């Protein structure tokens, strides 16, 4: 049997890392992943998928991930349960084994500042180089 998740989406908030009582780093995040088809209103719908990361992976995402960051995540689908007020609740989430931020700092800055255009505008032509 095989349990593998690969997704690309955007972080819905700045990831926050916490330490467990045994001093392990854990980061939880939600990733908005657009569906491949449009909904009845003509717009793309998104799924909001909970992700959990442990250790150095958690620390790295907490340091470099920001709200809106385009991210690729590999991992496994996990289900856990807990009791609250006599009710059993189930949570399905992705346990990440790796991730990659898919935007450069310049692309992220353009998105955050709502700058239109593409990165080719930022490249100097040979004639403009001082050497």
Swiss-Prot record:
Domain named SSB is located at: 1-103
Q: Name one Pfam family in it.
A: SSB
Read off the InterPro entries from this record: NA-bd_OB-fold (IPR012340), Primosome_PriB/ssb (IPR000424), ssDNA-bd (IPR011344)
Q: Which UniProt keywords apply?
A: DNA damage, DNA recombination, DNA repair, DNA replication, DNA-binding
What HAMAP family has UniProt attached to this entry?
A: SSB (MF_00984)
Q: How does it assemble?
A: Homotetramer.
The name this protein goes by in its record: Single-stranded DNA-binding protein 2
Q: State the organism of origin.
A: Streptococcus agalactiae serotype V (strain ATCC BAA-611 / 2603 V/R)
């Amino acid at each position: 049997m095989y349990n593998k998740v690969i997704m690309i989406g955007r972080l819905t908030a700045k990831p926050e890392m916490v330490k467990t009582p045994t001093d392990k780093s854990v980061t939880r995040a939600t990733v908005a992943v657009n569906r491949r088809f449009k909904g009845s209103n003509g717009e793309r719908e998104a799924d909001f998928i909970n992700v959990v990361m442990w250790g150095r992976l958690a620390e790295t995402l907490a340091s470099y991930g920001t709200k809106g960051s385009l991210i690729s995540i590999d991992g496994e689908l996990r289900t856990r349960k807990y009791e609250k007020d006599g009710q059993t609740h189930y949570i399905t989430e992705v346990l990440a084994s790796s991730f990659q931020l898919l935007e450069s700092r310049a692309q992220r800055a353009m998105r955050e500042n709502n700058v239109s255009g593409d990165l080719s505008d930022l490249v100097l032509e040979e004639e403009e180089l001082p050497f």
